Amino acid sequence: MEAKTSGPKQIQPSTPAPPPSTRRPRVREVSSRFMSPVTSSSSSAGDLHSLTCNSPKQHHLQHHQIQRSVSAQRLRRQLKMADGDENRSSETAARSLDSPFTLSQSRKSSKPSHLKPLNENSHRLETPTPMVPPPPSRSRLSQQRLPTATRLLQLSGISACYEKEGIINIQEKPKSNGSDQFPTLSCRTHLKVFNNPVPSSLNRSVSSPSSSCNVRESSSFSRLGLPLPPMAPKVPADTKKQRKVTEQLEDVHSLKLLHNRYLQWRFANANAQVKTQTHKTQTETMIHSFGSKISELHDSVQRKRIELQRLLKTKALLAITESQTPCLEQWSAIEEEYSTSVSQTIQAFSNASLRLPLDGDIMVDSKQLGDGLVAASKIVDGITQNVGNYMPKAKEMESLLSELTRVARSERSLTENCVVALLKTQASQVLNLSLHKLKNVL
């Protein structure tokens, strides 16, 4: 074992001692897993074996943890054997305890390089700090106090529990930041264990032994009269789930509000559509009634116009015949007189012819016969003169009667044309009303 530890000591270059620091040494922050005795390997391995689950992934993880715990115990033995060696720096010992790798790998990792920022506590990135070797006085002080603290914790019997917690923290611990030069178990590591999104089965498997370790730790500290170490605040592991649940509830509530608003708008649109439809039907019925009334008024107007034209024609005819009515009245009276006179003349001629003797000796007075013939000729001349006087009036009356018949014929033709025009107007009016209704419907 000494040969193994002397090999890395010869390879490590000597570093210049920095100026002494006035900072208080961080002895309380030394993790308990570095102070556990060598005999605690079986107990820690047994406890870790009890945390295994039925799944193959968790079994492989626990097997890897047991291998790391064995390597950490070997490094602790090397540290105890090389405790009196002053050439071995405290930083190398602390790094060898903190990591499960060899001392050469820890020495390679301690070289200055570009460090990746840590992501812990709600995935917040921290700026990396350069690694500064601790002062010699501080390393010596930590080497002196380390065995005493180890003895105290061996007496209390709580090193096994801290070793289990240390194994869990080794699995989840990121690369070294360089700000802490001692292998400490800070509160940030505990917070990262709670906040790290590891599977829930591993958290459940780790929770039961940690609670028993806390009970034994409190009882051991109460027996020794030492103050209890500060407990890390428990951060709920399901904050993200709660946040997601609240966001989902808010989304559901907003969707419900939007759905209610959509239903309100649909109801308003449907109500407005129904009102518009009723108003449209009422307007259509009113327009139809108005159209029927307008058609009736149009028919009455056409009838009135026809009657007016008829009255105008009658008035013109009356104006023409009104001047001829007195002549017609006189003609009736003259016709009666002339008819009576003609009848009397005929009777006188017949009487005179009957008085002539037809047999025996007839004696005729020529003078009386001549006087009778002269009187008869005078009567006939008067009759012919009167008839000649009434002949132009009769011709004029004949022309007027012919003109009256012609006007009556034209009136009859105009009446027939008016009937045809009325039929055409009615058909066009019906077509116009149907077109208006079709336009309103569209």
UniProtKB/Swiss-Prot annotation:
Q: Where is this region: Disordered?
A: 1-144, 221-240
Basic residues composition-biased segments: 57-66
Question: Which branch of life, at top level?
Answer: Eukaryota
Q: Which InterPro entries is this protein grouped with?
A: QWRF (IPR007573)
Locate the motif QWRF motif: 264-267
Q: Where is composition skewed (Basic and acidic residues) in this entry?
A: 80-89
The similarity annotation says: Belongs to the QWRF family.
Q: What is this protein called?
A: QWRF motif-containing protein 6
